[in-house]
């Protein structure tokens, strides 16, 4: 299973902002409170059978030593954090680095905020990566992300998902369902 690019084009960002209303039940705040992010991930993360795909120390290190200027948006319902996104700008695009939410409604609210940033900064769109049929890929599709269905053109590159292990190939480690492939864990992002 290869990792693929997902995207929302700038025109789609404008569509999202012009034809969807802001949900007043949610408040989105830009901050870097790592404890809130880890609590959201622990409570609402994609795969409950993965104990912890990164630690508080890893997240602190990653945000303290960025390759890019990371921005974190946390969505609250009342006083309760119910989702977050971490993103950065690169080469005229907004890259979604990490994400988690309690519901489709929350994820669409967060994507709407990213769409506003995309429009305000005159970016080409929002991009990220995931395995298409994984939980992450399904989340992105529900949030309005698309994939290029053609073999040529922009964002068609496959990013190989390779597992190097001394265990037999039929091991559960070799199943894509045992892995949570998110951009924050990719070395180059």
Residue map of PLM features:
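Amide-forming acyltransferase catalytic core, primarily the GNAT-like/NAT-type
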Residues: 1-98
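Active-site/acyl-donor-binding loops of N-acyltransferases
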Residues: 1-22, 77, 84, 88-108, ...
């Amino acid at each position: 299973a290869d990792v693929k690019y997902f995207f929302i084009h700038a025109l789609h960002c404008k569509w999202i902002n012009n034809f969807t209303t802001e949900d007043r039940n949610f408040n989105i705040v830009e901050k870097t409170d790592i404890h809130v992010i880890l609590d959201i991930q622990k409570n609402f993360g994609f795969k409950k059978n993965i104990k912890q795909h990164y630690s508080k120390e890893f997240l602190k290190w990653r945000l303290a030593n960025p390759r890019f200027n990371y921005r974190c948006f946390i969505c609250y319902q009342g006083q309760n954090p119910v989702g977050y996104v971490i993103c950065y700008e690169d080469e005229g695009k907004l890259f979604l680095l990490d994400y988690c939410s309690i519901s489709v409604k929350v994820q669409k609210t967060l994507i709407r905020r990213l769409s506003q940033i995309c429009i305000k900064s005159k970016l080409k769109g929002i991009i990220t990566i995931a395995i298409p049929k994984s939980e992450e890929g399904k989340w992105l599709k529900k949030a309005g992300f698309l994939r290029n269905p053609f073999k040529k053109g922009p964002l068609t590159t496959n990013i190989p998902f390779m597992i190097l292990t001394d265990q037999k190939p039929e091991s559960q480690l070799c199943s894509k369902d045992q892995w949570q492939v998110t951009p924050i864990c990719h070395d180059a992002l």
